[in-house]
Amino acid sequence: MTKEMWQLARMHELKDFGERLSHYENDEMLIDEVDEGFCNMMGYTQSELMIRSCGKVGDLVYPPDYEEIRYQIRKNLKQSGSYTCRYRMRKKDGSLIWVWENGRYEKDDTGRKNIRSLVVDVSREEKTMRERDTTYDNIPGG
């Protein structure tokens, strides 16, 4: 099994992931649609999510992460038509989650460039990595 196939199989085992379809308008990434998995991960119904975010992806991103993520996504989409990034999002209950996002351009029937993204909650993995780093940092001579 290739690494890519293993990662895809692993994604299907995860419960906290979803898809988002968006596009750029006036330098803002706007949400066109989200699936049920994305809404469940964020704690919203679809209508609540659209109202809360005003249809803007940036309104769901944790503000300290927003500018860097925005820059990286635009840069990578321009260079290769796809991107991968990690950042934090705020859920309906106010808690933060770490997400891994992989997106790419795809054209719709009208020729408009849309961005299809897979967004996965990687909070557990992020917590484990941070705890490991803290442990290593506290080892004498480490």
Report residues per predicted region.
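PAS and related sensory helical modules
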Residues: 28, 32, 39-59, 66-71, ...
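Short hydrophobic secondary-structure edge segments in sensory/regulatory modules of signaling proteins
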Residues: 17-23, 142
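Terminal output helix/cap of sensory domains in signal transduction proteins
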Residues: 64-86
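Short loop/turn elements at sensory-signaling interfaces that couple input to output
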Residues: 101-118
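PAS-family sensory domains
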Residues: 24-25, 88-94, 107
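PAS-associated C-terminal cap
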Residues: 1-7, 120-134
